[in-house]
């Protein structure tokens, strides 16, 4: 898939901007704080209806502006498509070919992107929340059913936590309602956990050989989904539900005392191991970076395998974080298959093969210009 044009209105430091992109590699050059990352973020938002940098939509709306709009014209294997995201204080709306979508989960997945930013190097060494968010964003864009179930899980979880907090503070002792919400929560939780485990298993199929190649055959990467409770069979929905019921039943009084839900997908994690050793605890910085790079490249292949179209790749100031060997592996992996967007403060750190195929743009104080 390819984005041909992007139009921004009142988006961060872009008052009104339109950019026409090249079909292969697009490089945005400029000093820090000029709007390069904002540009890549806009592509990410128009695809996934969420930012990779903030959870507050108002931060993306221009100063004292009522709303921001991102409009993209793209081409997929199935044909051309126009996408709109409108951000306002009232929320956000997504349109496909001018038609507003009833739910954002119906919108997400029309355009697929893979983002690789410096903070993604924290995928391995960061908190479990970072890894859960990674799964949710990547799996969500290829499975609307997963995204919808995750959203419903979040709503039920919020209700249950409010009730547990009230019970902790003696404002309510409604155990019957806790049981009702627990049953609803388990139904969604089991589906989310099963789909996440399947996704990690699929991702491992692609990431392991990539990691072997980058490490010159010296390292074997394995990925594991780690539920917050002991699950006898993560591939079996009924077994997951049974194990969740047991956990909630055993710890119900503890949850009331703590005023919060102690188990479920919102507390699960992913582990990365190299040659049997946990990379987060025992891996070198080089191994952690190779693992993050392998996982990101695996995403590209997994999305292609799922939908038959390559995603768009966003490289936000990340090439400078990789040595020449890892950089060359990244560039070799994308070749001419993937439309790529790169931000950098200088072209001096970029491989000559990149510059030979790239469309170059300067970014200065929210103004984007094509360099001939």
From Swiss-Prot:
The answer on whether this UniProt entry bears the keyword RNA-binding reads: no
Q: Which UniProt keywords apply?
A: ATP-binding, Cytoplasm, DNA damage, DNA repair, DNA replication, DNA-binding, Nucleotide-binding, SOS response
Extract the SUPFAM superfamilies matched here.
P-loop containing nucleoside triphosphate hydrolases
- Enumerate the PROSITE patterns for this protein: RECF_1 (PS00617), RECF_2 (PS00618)
Q: Where in the cell is it found?
A: Cytoplasm
Q: Which family does it belong to?
A: Belongs to the RecF family.
Return the PANTHER family for the record.
Answer: DNA REPLICATION AND REPAIR PROTEIN RECF
Instruction: Identify this protein by name.
Output: DNA replication and repair protein RecF
Q: What organism does this protein naturally occur in?
A: Shouchella clausii (strain KSM-K16) (Alkalihalobacillus clausii)
GN (gene name) = recF
